[in-house]
Amino acid sequence: MKAYAKANIFLKLTGFDSRKYHLLESRFILLKDVFDELELVDKESDSKKEFEIISNFKCENNIIQKAYLLLSRRYNNELKELFSKKSLKLTKNIPVCAGLGGGSSDCASFLLLINETLNLKLNLQELINLSIQLGSDIAFFLSGFHSANVSSCGEIIEEFEDDIPNLKWTFPQISCQTKAVYDEFDRGIFDFQKNNNQAQIYKKLSTKELLQNFKNKELNDLFTPCATLYPKMKSYLQEDFFLSGSGSSVFKVDR
């Protein structure tokens, strides 16, 4: 099963919820050319792990492990039987700490894979309700939408009929830590009401219109704090690249 990456075309921070998590308004688009792959493979006879992930990526305590534990609360016997014979193979291609949602997409694909394999018959809303307990962005990947306006903490998704130009991507060898970038944003000067007003305009425009008519700093509230924390990102900010998420992946319209 393919776990596709995403890009944020705009990302506006609009407040905090009761847990002090940031509220956002964003346009997510699916990147069909950038993906990880998940599959169930026969378990090696000498493996002692109850749930084993085989990967080219360090997987201890990652979000898939958390999803497995969450599902185990309701489907412990079914999962134990499945993973007594199978291991999960995860092939990572999506750059890590790059603002492309790789971990969230992997988690969504794992939930879909288990739902299908064990015939759990969980509907989309039930899967989204599970995903809210695991992290943001997962709901978008569960939806299967190619483009959507996403709000709150990532769990409210509205499909958007979009016009998406070809994008040319650059993946800097810079690991941008999401929490650090958000913390840097919080140290700056911001106006949540202004951000929300801008977001309401952006939500009505196509991706093509957004990238043609607005500057990178206007579209993504995290670009300036990202460049402050990671000075090598400043050149991309100055050269009119657009930032996905909290970085470090950047893009331009491929003209």
Curated annotation (Swiss-Prot):
SUPFAM superfamilies: GHMP Kinase, C-terminal domain, Ribosomal protein S5 domain 2-like. The active site is at 6, 137. Its EC number is 2.7.1.148. Signal peptide: none annotated. Pathway: Isoprenoid biosynthesis; isopentenyl diphosphate biosynthesis via DXP pathway; isopentenyl diphosphate from 1-deoxy-D-xylulose 5-phosphate: step 3/6. GO terms for biological process: isopentenyl diphosphate biosynthetic process, methylerythritol 4-phosphate pathway; terpenoid biosynthetic process. InterPro entries: GHMP_kinase_C_sf (IPR036554), GHMP_kinase_N_dom (IPR006204), IspE (IPR004424), Ribosomal_Su5_D2-typ_SF (IPR020568), Ribsml_uS5_D2-typ_fold_subgr (IPR014721). Gene3D superfamilies: 3.30.230.10, GHMP kinase, C-terminal domain. Keywords: ATP-binding, Isoprene biosynthesis, Kinase, Nucleotide-binding, Transferase. ATP binds at residues 95-105. GO terms for molecular function: 4-(cytidine 5'-diphospho)-2-C-methyl-D-erythritol kinase activity; ATP binding. The keyword Magnesium does not apply. It comes from the Bacteria. It is an enzyme of class 2 (transferase). It catalyses: 4-CDP-2-C-methyl-D-erythritol + ATP = 4-CDP-2-C-methyl-D-erythritol 2-phosphate + ADP + H(+). Belongs to the GHMP kinase family. IspE subfamily. HAMAP family: IspE (MF_00061). Catalyzes the phosphorylation of the position 2 hydroxy group of 4-diphosphocytidyl-2C-methyl-D-erythritol. This is 4-diphosphocytidyl-2-C-methyl-D-erythritol kinase. The gene is ispE.
